[in-house]
Regions:
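N-terminal secretory signal peptides that target proteins for export/translocation
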Residues: 1-8
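C-terminal segment of classical bacterial N-terminal signal peptides
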Residues: 18-31
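Electrostatic cytochrome c docking/interface patches
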Residues: 29-47, 58
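The canonical Cys-X-X-Cys-His
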Residues: 43, 48-56, 130, 134
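Detector for the c-type heme attachment site
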Residues: 54-60, 73-74
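Short cysteine/histidine-rich zinc-coordinating motifs and their immediately flanking basic loops
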Residues: 62-67
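Short Fe-S-cluster ligation motifs
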Residues: 78-98
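C-terminal capping alpha-helices of c-type cytochrome domains
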Residues: 94-140
């Protein structure tokens, strides 16, 4: 006959289960974090080409291109103290993940006569990575 009280056994069981989940997080969580890190790191590498013309932190001055800080949810071609070309001033869309993906795919199709020296990213995976990275670094 087991002399350990029911309450004590229950406490031990809860402790063991809690310890297992603390030491070994669920596999899906590990895979998701790894995938997100993979895209973030790829986006960071891709963005190195962008920083020659763009800044991305609050209160940084513009370069050849506008500061990208706070771009998601903002109307394209509208940034305080930046003089956009007529093509950009006439842009009629809000920056979202979808519009940025379309722009990154073919910038000159989306904004004809756009002066930005960027021909686009054909790789959907690269566009996804750059968008994930930008969402992390340019949002307030």
């Amino acid at each position: 006959m087991n002399k350990t009280p029911y309450c004590t056994r229950l406490i031990i069981l809860v402790f063991v289960i809690f310890s297992l989940f603390t030491i070994f997080p669920p596999i899906s969580h590990i895979n998701f974090a790894h995938a997100a890190d993979k895209y973030f790191l790829r986006g960071q590498k891709l963005f190195k080409k962008c920083i020659h013309c763009h800044t991305y932190k609050v209160a940084q001055t513009h370069r050849i291109g506008p500061n990208l800080y706070g771009m998601f949810g903002r109307k394209a071609g509208k940034v305080v103290n930046f003089d956009f070309s007529e093509a950009w001033k006439n842009a009629n869309f809000i920056w979202t993940e979808k519009t940025l993906d379309n722009y990154l795919l073919d910038p000159h199709k989306m904004i004809p006569n756009n002066q930005m020296p960027f021909d686009g990213l054909s790789s959907a995976s690269d566009r996804k990575a750059l968008i994930i990275y930008l969402k992390k670094i340019v949002q307030p």
